[in-house]
UniProtKB/Swiss-Prot annotation:
Gene Ontology CC: cytosolic large ribosomal subunit
Gene of this entry: rpl10
Record organism: Methanosarcina mazei (strain ATCC BAA-159 / DSM 3647 / Goe1 / Go1 / JCM 11833 / OCM 88) (Methanosarcina frisia)
Stretches the record annotates as Disordered: 310-347
Record keyword Ribonucleoprotein present: yes
Protein name, per record: Large ribosomal subunit protein uL10
Family: Belongs to the universal ribosomal protein uL10 family.
Source species taxonomy: Archaea, Methanobacteriati, Methanobacteriota, Stenosarchaea group, Methanomicrobia
Positions of disulphide bridges: none
Length: 347
């Protein structure tokens, strides 16, 4: 203990102040995280700091001082020290970890790759014209391994080609040509390593939520819950109307099929009996025209006319259905509005 006190006494005051400042920032914000800043230009970091100033505080400090501050705060906070690696900055916010992750992803922008840098993925130059007129640029592209020629008075790439595979170092000539072609293979920004919120540590794999899929999952879950409630006859505020309608339809069907003479099914029973009667009469008339009287003949004629009219009306109904298709587009817009509402959940 004496040795630790002796060591502490020799810490410069500016370091003590820095440790206290980190502790105060952690305690005054709901969430804090650690981000990788290795390889990011100072100007880019300053721009990100300005862009986030209304929602987050970005602080760059020495890892050793950050570690001391975390250890002094105790509880589960010291577990965040395992995310201190190479060049690390701290970020503080009162937003949720999900919102913080999304904000940091939005800071990322395409950036040119330097000579000697390792390609994070295959670098592909697409076939097509460039903005360059014929000149020395043609030879420069070819010497960089980019197949180029003159086409319609412009330098053009003759074929789509992988000019550098993932994991390979980018040659000097190729790096120069990629910048001239405005091909930026790197995505530069702050990578969140972890976020701490009220005793819980969130890693980026958990925070990378696909909002479209999440929205679809919620819709599907609601539909499944609704169907389960209806099929198991479990009444809720959302399903009681459907359950009552289903019960009414099933009871009416039972009454009709069992020929139960109740006021609620008499119309259906009479309609069913009428259909059966006309069917029998029609078959009898086909065998013997004198088998039915004039009244039945009139009924059969009316039924035949109705059937013919229905046949003529079918194409018109199909056309009307096509005219109703714009309503489906309105439903799509409604779903998009729903997704926008879900987006607000994550910022």
């Amino acid at each position: 203990m004496a040795e630790e006190r002796h060591h502490t006494e020799h810490i410069p005051q500016w370091k003590k102040d820095e440790i206290e400042n980190i502790k105060e920032l952690i305690q005054s914000h709901k969430v804090f995280g650690m981000v990788r800043i290795e390889g990011i230009l100072a100007t880019k970091i300053q721009k990100i700091r300005r862009d986030l100033k209304d929602v987050a505080v970005l602080k760059v400090s020495r890892n050793t001082l950050t570690e001391r501050a975390l250890n002094q705060l105790g509880e589960s906070i010291p577990e965040m020290t395992r995310y201190l690696d190479n060049q690390t900055a701290l970020i503080f916010t009162n937003e949720s970890p999900f919102k913080l992750y999304k904000l940091l992803e939005q800071t990322k922008t395409p950036s040119p790759i330097k000579a000697g840098a390792i390609a994070p993925e295959d670098i592909i130059v697409q076939k097509g014209p460039t903005s360059f007129p014929p000149g020395p640029i043609l030879g420069e592209l070819q010497s960089a391994g980019i197949p180029a020629s003159i086409d319609a008075g412009k330098v053009a790439v003759k074929e789509t080609k992988v000019v550098c595979k993932a994991g390979e170092a980018v040659p000097q000539k190729l790096a120069t040509m990629l910048s001239k072609l405005e091909i930026y293979p790197l995505i530069v920004g702050l990578d969140l390593r972890a976020a701490y919120d009220d005793g819980t540590i969130y890693e980026p794999e958990l925070l990378a939520v696909d909002e479209s899929k999440y929205f679809s999952d919620i819709i599907r879950a609601a539909q499944n819950a609704f169907n389960l409630s209806v099929n198991t006859a479990y009444p809720t505020g959302a399903t009681i109307g459907t359950l009552l309608a289903k019960a009414y339809a099933e009871s009416k069907s039972l009454g009709v099929n069992a020929v139960i003479l109740e006021p609620g099914v008499m119309d259906s029973l009479l309609a069913k009996a009428h259909v059966q009667m006309t069917s029998v009469a029609s078959e009898a008339a086909e065998k013997d025209a004198n088998a039915v009287d004039d009244d039945l003949r009139e009924v059969l004629g009316a039924a035949a006319s109705a059937a013919a009219a229905a046949t003529v009306a079918a194409p018109a109904a199909e056309e009307e259905k096509k005219e109703e298709e714009p309503e489906e587009e309105e439903e799509d817009h409604a779903e998009e509005d729903g997704m926008a509402g879900l987006g607000a959940l994550f910022g």
